[in-house]
C-alpha cells in the first residue's frame, strides 16, 4: 500500500466565483501570496477566469472544525496520521455561465500504511464549502 497520494473532487458553486474564492482565503486565513488569478479569452468572446491557491496546509485549519462539526457534516478523521496534508483550490468562472466550478485537491503522505486515505477530511471540506456557498448565495441576493 502506497503512503503518498492525491484525492480530488469537483463541485458546482452558485455564488459569484470571485466572492467564493475571497471568502475561502479569508475564512481559512490563507496566505494571499500563493494566490494566482488567470484570465483567458474563450471562444465567442467570453472570458474564463481561474482563481487558484496551492499548497495550503490543511491540518491546523481542519482541527479547528472538530468542535463545530454538525451531524450533517462528515465524521471526524484525525489529520495527525499524515506527514503531509496539503490542499489546492481552483475556482473557474466562464462569463454567461450560470454555474461556476470548484476543484479541491488534497495531496497527502501517510505516516504508515495503517492510516486510511483522507477521504473523510475531503468530505468535510466539501460540505463546509457547499454550506459557505449557500450562505454567500443568500447574502448576495
Swiss-Prot record:
Domain of life where this protein originates: Eukaryota
Biological-process GO terms, alphabetical: defense response
Any Pfam family the entry gives: Bet_v_1
Gene3D superfamilies assigned: 3.30.530.20
SMART domains named in the record: Bet_v_1
Name of the protein: Uncharacterized protein At1g24010
Organism: Arabidopsis thaliana
